[in-house]
């Protein structure tokens, strides 16, 4: 999926107001799931996950489960690790 700047993203997204829904497909290349940081604080809610994991900088990965809510402070490095099936999340900034 290409963003407005012409960069490829490993997800599809749909924005509704201050909420963004993202879907990462089960066949996402693991090389696309890179360490990154965001400019704003984010609250991520897991809608669908089967073995996908989330990792903050200097912490061990945690398995994402449906209903989990993760607070990610701005400028904090983090990444996701691929599991089975799709990962569906909502992001509130």
Language model segments and positions:
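Short, conserved beta-strand element in jelly-roll/cupin
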Residues: 38-53
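Short, Lys/Arg-enriched N-terminal segments with co-localized hydrophobic residues
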Residues: 1-7
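Double-stranded beta-helix
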Residues: 8-24, 88-93
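Well-ordered beta-strand positions
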Residues: 45-47, 63, 71, 81
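Short acidic-glycine-tyrosine-enriched beta hairpin
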Residues: 58-75
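Conserved short histidine dyad/triad with adjacent acidic residue
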Residues: 20-39
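Ligand-binding loop in jelly-roll beta-barrel domains
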Residues: 73-93
């Amino acid at each position: 999926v290409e963003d407005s700047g012409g960069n490829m993203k490993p997800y599809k997204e749909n924005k509704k107001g201050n909420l963004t829904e993202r879907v990462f497909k089960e066949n996402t290349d693991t090389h696309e799931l890179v360490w990154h940081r965001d400019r704003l604080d984010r609250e991520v809610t897991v809608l669908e996950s089967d073995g996908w994991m989330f990792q903050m900088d200097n912490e061990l990965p945690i398995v994402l489960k449906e209903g989990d809510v993760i607070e990610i402070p701005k400028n904090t490095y983090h990444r996701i690790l691929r599991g089975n099936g799709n990962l569906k999340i909502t992001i509130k900034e």
